[in-house]
């Protein structure tokens, strides 16, 4: 593979339907510290094919799912905590942190598009796998949040992922006792990085 020091370009594939907000901070840091090296993003939305690579034309990939690609390393990159999304008129707003037992009294809306994301498994562990009984599945996260805003139920997801829906009739509270979760993974080749690539990876790890 040609060194990105020669091409002065970092190519990153962004996998899945959601882009972590930290990516904007990473790109801004890259521009400020190394403006001569351009970061080129390529979106790729197909969460159902977690074991496959979209193509071979990139240096890094950013994913909400831990992926196993031959010849690549997948490392946890950015972390978050679980939160509860609810309608702005919900009685759950009385809680500073929503207790798990209150969640189990509600209809919980989840999206099929996030099924393979690691935080979904964490949610089930927190509730000892009994949450399935209360879940209503819809196709996408956007549809799930639309129903939440309309008062049809609540949703559980990383706090940063819910933040962008606050202007759509949705309120957010932390989930009481929730563990820290991995929100995004960085994938890179299992080989020596060029100096340019190594600096980009270091900046990615510095962003929180």
Language-model regions: role of each:
Residues 72-82, 86-108, 198:
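Flexible hinge/capping segments at coil-to-helix
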Residues 9-15, 61, 85, 109, ...:
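Short, well-ordered beta-strand segments
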Residues 70-76, 80, 142-192:
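Beta-alpha-beta core module
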Residues 1-13, 32, 70-73, 94, ...:
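Short helix-loop hinge/linker segments at domain boundaries
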Residues 7-68:
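Central regulatory/effector-binding core of bacterial HTH transcription factors
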Residues 10, 22-25, 171-208:
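A late-sequence structural motif
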Residues 23, 106-130, 193-197, 201:
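Secondary-structure junction motif
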């Amino acid at each position: 593979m040609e060194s990105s020091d020669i091409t002065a370009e970092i190519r990153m594939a962004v996998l899945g339907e959601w882009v972590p907000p930290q990516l904007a901070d990473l790109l801004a840091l890259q521009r400020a510290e190394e403006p001569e090296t351009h970061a080129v993003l390529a979106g790729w939305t197909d969460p159902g094919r977690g074991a496959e690579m979209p193509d071979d034309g990139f240096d890094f990939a950013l994913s909400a799912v831990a992926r196993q690609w031959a010849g690549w390393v997948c490392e946890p990159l950015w972390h978050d905590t679980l939160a509860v999304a609810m309608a702005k008129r919900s009685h759950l707003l009385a809680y500073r942190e929503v207790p798990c037992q209150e969640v189990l009294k509600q209809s919980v809306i989840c999206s099929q598009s996030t099924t393979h994301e690691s935080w979904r498994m964490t949610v089930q562990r927190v509730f000892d796998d009994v949450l399935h009984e209360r879940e209503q599945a819809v196709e996408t996260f956007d549809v799930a949040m639309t129903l939440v805003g309309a008062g049809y139920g609540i949703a559980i997801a990383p706090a940063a992922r819910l933040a962008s829906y606050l202007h759509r009739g949705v309120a957010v509270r932390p989930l009481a006792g929730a563990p820290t979760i991995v929100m995004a993974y960085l994938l890179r080749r299992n080989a020596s990085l060029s100096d340019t690539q190594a600096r980009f990876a270091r900046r990615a790890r510095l962003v929180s």
